[in-house]
Amino acid sequence: MLYNLLLPHIHNSHIANLFHYITFRSGLAIIITLSISFVTGPILIKFLRSLQKYGQPIRSDGPESHKTKAGTPTMGGIMIILSSCLSTLLLADLTNKYIWITLFGFISFGIIGFMDDYAKVKRNNHYGVRGKSKFLLQGIISLIIYVLLEYLDKNFSHLLNVPFFKNLSLDLNYFYMVFAIFVIVGSSNAVNLTDGLDGLATVPIAFTAGSFALISYLVGNLIYANYLQLTYIPNTGELTVLCAGLVGSCLGFLWFNAQPAEVFMGDTGSLSLGGVLGIISVITKHEIVLAIIGGLFVIETTSVILQVYYFKATKGKRIFKMAPLHHHFEKHGWAESKVVIRFWIISVIFSLIGLSSLKLR
């Protein structure tokens, strides 16, 4: 909004001219989201405590240390969605189609997560909305997003770019629709599975969002895209502002989510954040790079898939003491803080590997 209001005055005002730069607005987005989080956090937590008698239900088969988390409110993802959306509406170019499509997906996945959190709190168990119903809703939202991209972007490509290789792209043609939906839904649920310890998912999400802030900026800039031999996609640079807002909102949320957590993001936060990262990767044509940068999410999801299939195939045997993987290490005696920090380190490594693909070809 501010960008659109100040745009006519960029040649007459130094301040207005600053808003012409994506980098300035992105930095401002981080400051604004942090400020909103710090101000609204205590108010929201108090409000959620008053509404949730028992807080987020704690799994009875989980690590013993988790019993101390009983009574901690959930749905803290509302704080992340609120601050991110407000900063984007304030600072991004509101004539940009990618901004509106991404915000639509972000909020829609947040609503699905809210429904799941509400069901858990109301029933006082950790089951929530049925898995099939959740997948169906996520699939429908992802399909709508894909149709919007196809309809609003006449040059929307079905090519799948392969990182670390020059000019290597696979034309998925009509299958790209299925692939795009898989990326968005998969990303949403992968982040959701990772969000099992205080602060565990928050920092890797911030790393991933920060990485895609850079990717969006480079892909949307003709000079940089040509230099790095990336697929140039006009107008994607504005997503940098949104990604920067996600970084700030995650850091702001971490202030309250660090161990011992005062609030959990819940599915409201994890499904929406995972979904929005998937959407941005599809728009910027960096779907495989998302799997690299978000490698921690992939590992956590894979551990669950392996555990479930092995359990069924062997009629009761397990590969891990508990899945997702972070619980396995807890069961091995690792302190929660050690698991979280070591997983953060792994996330940094994956982010660096993913970003290196922009240059190493």
From Swiss-Prot:
EC no.? 2.7.8.13
A GO biological process this protein is involved in? cell division
InterPro entries named among the record's database cross-references: Glycosyl_transferase_4 (IPR000715), PNAcMuramoyl-5peptid_Trfase (IPR003524), PNAcMuramoyl-5peptid_Trfase_CS (IPR018480)
Q: Which Pfam families match?
A: Glycos_transf_4 (PF00953), MraY_sig1 (PF10555)
Subcellular location, principal: membrane
Reply yes or no: does the keyword Cell wall biogenesis/degradation apply: yes
Any one GO MF term held by the record is: metal ion binding
Kindly list the cofactors needed. Answer: Mg(2+)
Query: Which key words are in the record?
Result: Cell cycle, Cell division, Cell inner membrane, Cell membrane, Cell shape, Cell wall biogenesis/degradation, Magnesium, Membrane, Metal-binding, Peptidoglycan synthesis, Transferase, Transmembrane, Transmembrane helix
Q: Which reaction equation describes what this protein catalyses?
A: UDP-N-acetyl-alpha-D-muramoyl-L-alanyl-gamma-D-glutamyl-meso-2,6-diaminopimeloyl-D-alanyl-D-alanine + di-trans,octa-cis-undecaprenyl phosphate = di-trans,octa-cis-undecaprenyl diphospho-N-acetyl-alpha-D-muramoyl-L-alanyl-D-glutamyl-meso-2,6-diaminopimeloyl-D-alanyl-D-alanine + UMP
Protein origin, superkingdom: Bacteria
Residues that span the membrane, as ranges:
28-48, 74-94, 99-119, 133-153, 168-188, 203-223, 236-256, 263-283, 288-308, 338-358
Q: Where in the cell is it found?
A: Cell inner membrane
Membrane topology according to the record = Multi-pass membrane protein
Its cellular-component GO annotations read:
plasma membrane
According to the UniProt record, what class of enzyme is this?
transferase
Name the pathway it acts in. Cell wall biogenesis; peptidoglycan biosynthesis
Q: What does this protein do?
A: Catalyzes the initial step of the lipid cycle reactions in the biosynthesis of the cell wall peptidoglycan: transfers peptidoglycan precursor phospho-MurNAc-pentapeptide from UDP-MurNAc-pentapeptide onto the lipid carrier undecaprenyl phosphate, yielding undecaprenyl-pyrophosphoryl-MurNAc-pentapeptide, known as lipid I.
Q: Which family does it belong to?
A: Belongs to the glycosyltransferase 4 family. MraY subfamily.
- Entry protein name: Phospho-N-acetylmuramoyl-pentapeptide-transferase
Q: Which organism is it from?
A: Rickettsia prowazekii (strain Madrid E)
Q: Which gene encodes it?
A: mraY
